[in-house]
Design a protein with these regions (language model features):
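Short, ordered, surface-exposed loop/turn motifs in non-cytosolic proteins
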Residues: 20-23, 27-42, 59
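Extended active-site neighborhood of metal-dependent phosphoesterases/phosphodiesterases
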Residues: 70-76, 83-86, 163-253, 276-295, ...
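Beta-strand-rich domain onsets/edges
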Residues: 11-21
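Short, acidic Ser/Thr/Gly-rich low-complexity loop/linker segments typical of extracellular
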Residues: 39-56
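Short acidic, glycine-rich surface-loop motifs adjacent to enzyme active sites
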Residues: 250-271
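Active-site glycine-centered loops adjacent to acidic/histidine catalytic or metal-binding residues
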Residues: 115, 155-156, 184-185, 264, ...
Length: 317
């Protein structure tokens, strides 16, 4: 009995040690911002009226990130909004600065781009000469009309060629709009054999593989629905950790919110008799009571599907 009690105590202490308290601030123009949601990818906190937040960060966390509020934008680095900081267990403080994004509180345009996936320098040349001019024309047109714009790249940013991440990222940065990334199956490193290791190159360039931000009246959630097993073997599912995180986030939203979940592989497989991935079913259950949209890539087709009452998928070529 004594040994059992010692074992239970050790387990309890181990569980307590799995989270480390951190502190930080959220400001805009040097002024505190209250009510901003902060997450380590496991749990959530919120900044107070002084812009201060405290969070028990999980030891397995990779990033501390903000849910950028509507009407605001994190500073850009290479076109990527810096709403995140890499988690360092030795660091106790994480400070964030946002900037106003006038006009985006109600009206904005989102450029959804899927599967550019260059594999060779020739592919990259074609991306630069054929695809980017059309995207640049769209963003230029938006600026002429005074519309705020952002872009989201829905995975397969490259085709098993992580050495091209920097070049592709630079091309999208040239659009002059914030660019949000989604990881695809071809964005995983073929030389790695665990999902965490295989996403390292992607994370270095684009940040977290799952996160959230607000634009207009829509709550955007980006998820990684590729469970990678190495050597090009993967499952199209959302892992349990992300499902728990997303479900906890759903509970923080006002009833009847408009939610858009961005991921690479479609939630519904029209070519498999409209089969819906099991983890997407669980996700839809978690967001019941909200207006839910999926925006996905992977198929190289443009399609719209009503999956169930109040749930629509927009699959982008």
């Amino acid at each position: 009995m004594k040994n059992l009690l010692l074992f239970l105590l050790a387990c309890s202490l181990g569980a307590a040690a799995a989270a480390r308290p951190i502190r930080g601030s959220v400001k805009c123009g040097g002024k505190p911002m209250g009510g901003v949601t902060v997450t380590d990818g496991y749990t959530f906190a919120q900044s107070d009226e002084q812009g201060i937040f405290t969070l028990d960060a999980d030891d397995q966390a990779l990033f501390i990130s903000l849910v950028t509020p509507s009407g605001y934008l994190a500073p850009l680095d290479g076109g990527i909004p810096q709403f995140y900081r890499a988690y360092d267990p030795a660091a106790k403080r994480y400070d964030f600065e946002l900037q106003p994004w006038p006009g985006s509180g109600e009206c904005y345009e989102l450029l959804a781009i899927a599967d550019p996936q260059p594999k060779t320098e020739e592919h990259f040349r074609r991306l630069r000469s054929e695809v980017m001019p059309a995207l640049q024309a769209a963003t230029d047109n938006g600026r002429t009309r005074g519309s705020n714009q952002a872009a989201i790249v829905l995975g397969d940013i490259v085709w098993d060629s992580p050495e091209l991440f920097a070049g592709v990222k630079a091309e999208f940065a040239g659009l002059g709009v914030p660019v949000y990334g989604v990881i695809g199956n071809h964005d995983h490193d073929l030389n790695k054999y665990t999902d965490r290791e295989a996403t390292e190159n992607y994370r270095r360039h684009f940040g977290p593989t799952y996160y959230a931000f607000d634009m207009g009246r829509t709550h955007y959630i980006v998820l990684d629905d590729i469970v990678y097993h190495g050597a090009k073997k993967y499952e199209e599912q959302i892992d349990t950790m992300q499902l728990r995180w997303a479900a906890a986030y759903a509970e923080r939203l006002p009833a009847g919110s408009r939610v858009c979940i961005a991921m690479h592989a479609p939630a519904m497989k029209s070519w498999l008799g409209n089969r819906v991935m099991e983890s997407a079913e669980r996700l839809m259950d978690a967001f019941a009571g909200h207006e839910l949209h999926f925006i996905t890539g992977h198929t190289h087709l443009n399609s719209n599907y009503d999956i169930r009452e109040g749930v629509t998928e927009h699959n982008v070529a």
